[in-house]
Design a protein with these regions (language model features):
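Walker A/P-loop nucleotide-binding motif
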Residues: 40-57
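Short conserved motifs of the RecA-like P-loop NTPase core
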Residues: 174-186
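Dynamic helix-loop-helix/coil hinge segments at AAA+ ATPase domain boundaries and subdomain interfaces
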Residues: 6-28
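Conserved AAA+ ATPase "SRH/arginine-finger" region at the nucleotide-binding site
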Residues: 136, 147-159
Length: 225
């Protein structure tokens, strides 16, 4: 493989942190997660797909670990992690995509029993999901209703443009003229998909030693419609 094929300058994937999250209208939510969590309390972080829920719950987990607290992270979109609900405990349990269990009778009972145990043990819980409406078990819906609700709003156009510019700077790639406007007009308008596009473009740009230009973005959107 030739040297020009290696993206030598590409930085490792960014670690989710509070300070590298483009908050936009969500500053109060981010502030609560970063500094306002109360020991033993429960929180439900809601929001549409692509609003940054996964980024923020990962940041919560990293932050609690940094503080020396006992924390466990469970990504329920991965079915293999569901058994962790039976084992989890400590100071904090952080759950991404909790609504992946919605409509699954066994999964809902597993979560309900875990929540009862965590309440008795005064374990703090931070959960993320689109909403709580997917759950059918009335007792579980009641339990989830005891969590403080935090809701993420989608970024507006100016905030998405700022995110694209900041991500490109982090990866040390040059944005071609008009590329931000092109991305906003052609790519899905959610933060997660836009970040994926910038990171894929940065990899290609650094590999091929070119700017992150409109033709490159057009190629990427053709590869990943």
């Amino acid at each position: 493989m030739s040297r020009t094929q290696l993206p030598l300058a590409l930085k490792p994937p960014r670690r989710p942190r509070f300070d590298n999250f483009i908050a936009g209208a969500n500053r109060a939510v981010v502030a609560t997660l970063a500094e306002g969590l109360e020991a033993g309390a429960w929180y439900f972080l809601g929001g549409a797909h692509g609003t940054g829920r996964s980024h923020l719950v990962a940041a919560v987990f990293a932050d609690r670990c940094r503080r020396g607290e006992r924390a466990l992270f469970i990504a329920l979109a991965d079915r293999r992690q569901r058994p962790l609900l039976e084992q989890a405990g400590g100071d904090w349990v952080v759950i991404d995509d909790v609504d992946a269990l919605g409509g699954d009778d066994d999964g809902e009972r597993l979560l309900f029993n875990a929540l009862n145990r965590w309440r008795a043990e005064r374990t703090g819980v931070v959960m993320s999901g689109v909403s709580r409406e997917a759950f059918r078990l009335p007792d579980l819906r009641s339990r989830l209703g005891q969590a403080t609700r935090l809701t993420l709003k989608p970024l507006d156009e100016a905030e998405l443009a700022d995110m694209v510019t900041r991500l490109a700077a982090e990866h040390e790639v040059v944005l071609g003229r008009g590329v931000v406007d092109y991305m906003l007009s052609r790519a899905p308008r959610n933060a997660a998909r836009m970040a994926q596009l910038v990171e894929a473009g940065a990899r290609r740009a650094l590999t091929e030693r070119r700017t992150l230009s409109i033709p490159l973005v057009r190629e990427l959107l053709g590869d990943h419609p």
